[in-house]
């Protein structure tokens, strides 16, 4: 498969974003997949246009977006995105939407059509912390996952799409002993394992849900 993997620019006055740092270190061939890479701005207003232009000028079987989830302690494939922008902080354009629909003609939610349980289990099988997430938040990460679902629904019926959140890396949590992090090389290994699990097969039917 031809897979586009995206990461984000730093945001919230940080100098680094582990999503893009990890994406840049991915091999260009992973398993049977050819990997292209794209850096996205942390901008509600810009990401849609960039994604639209990229998909219009290239054929991709899969788009997999990667984002930072500070405070998480695992690599977490996302199951679903919701049709809301509700930003706790401004984005890099100083834009802070509150309770705004992403697409007025879109569904209330879009589920990733990637094998998210198989991807999660593949991370775990590498001895790395992995978990299936049921919330991508309401910032630009959720926005991108939702927009990809919208494009698949309205324009690219054969497109497969998904999102993975990754933790901070250690240099982001210096002096913050209670904040989890993960070495960059482990994030790269986890993303590689997750990408290797992407296939045309049905997802695994295993218990990776939560009770709360």
Swiss-Prot record:
Subunit structure: Homotetramer.
Subcellular location: Cytoplasm
Family the UniProt entry places it in: Belongs to the peptidase C15 family.
Superkingdom of origin organism: Bacteria
Gene from which the chain derives: pcp
CDD domains listed in its UniProt record: Peptidase_C15
PROSITE patterns: PYRASE_CYS, PYRASE_GLU
Role summary: Removes 5-oxoproline from various penultimate amino acid residues except L-proline.
Chief place of localization: cytoplasm
Entry's EC annotation: 3.4.19.3
A GO molecular function held by the record: pyroglutamyl-peptidase activity
Keywords: Cytoplasm, Hydrolase, Protease, Thiol protease
Keyword Cytoplasm assigned: yes
UniProt-recorded name of the protein: Pyrrolidone-carboxylate peptidase
Claim: Manganese is one of the keywords in the record: no
Active site: 78, 141, 165
Catalytic activity: Release of an N-terminal pyroglutamyl group from a polypeptide, the second amino acid generally not being Pro
Pfam families: Peptidase_C15
GO biological process: proteolysis
GO cellular component terms given for this protein: cytosol
